[in-house]
Amino acid sequence: ARRGSPLAVGYGHEENYLGSDSYALKSMTNKITYLDDGDICVLSNNKVEFYNSKNIKINKEVLTLSDDKHTTDKGDHKDFMSKEINEQHVTAQTCIKEYVDQLRQDINLYHFPIEPKDITKIILIGCGTAYHSCVTAKYWFEELTNIPVEIDIASEFRYRKLKFDNKNLYVFVSQSGETADTYAALDLCKKNNVKTCAIVNVVESSIARTSDFVLPIHAGPEIGVASTKAFIGQMLVLYLLVLKMSEVRKEIS
């Protein structure tokens, strides 16, 4: 059963698996189902059944994981840290390729959940490295979009006396997309019907699936504890978001 922490089911041939996320299961299967909070899973080697918190049987979507050119193998590197440092430029190139239309010379954010002209405040929320990327992005947003910005450590966000406003944009930054405090802050925002955006590395994660809008950082698996390429990806995606919002608001041309 899932309560708080993430949980996923992987499907195999005459065997099924439980794991925290797609990275934990990807070496065994590319077919997975994510449980929502309160879901119950009855698992055997050839059968998987799901129930909600009221013990009613439910159907869950089976996702097919895409092939990822990034692997959890060290390759020729002595450790994951050096490997991931050397992959930083790949993350930057992938982000630019994904979000920047070179022919039109435009930044494509697809279906953004709120008109940038209508945003009165941006709230950036994260923990650890993600929080530090938010601290830097605050200066960019205020300088280039002329929108006031607040930053919150996710673990503190829920304990403030908050006034939610549907003209505010709440941006949640997380490498894994499963950071417990960040997810709890997002859940509070969803209960108050405000617009949310996730900047994550794992597009199938709880934070990504719960948010109104997702901007993946395309860093691939990051095994090293000290964030390297994921931090670069977060910073770059935040900067592209700043540039696009500035353009739409006619703060820059």
What are these regions (language model features)?
Residues 117-251:
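Glycine-rich phosphate-binding loops that contact phosphosugars or nucleotide phosphates
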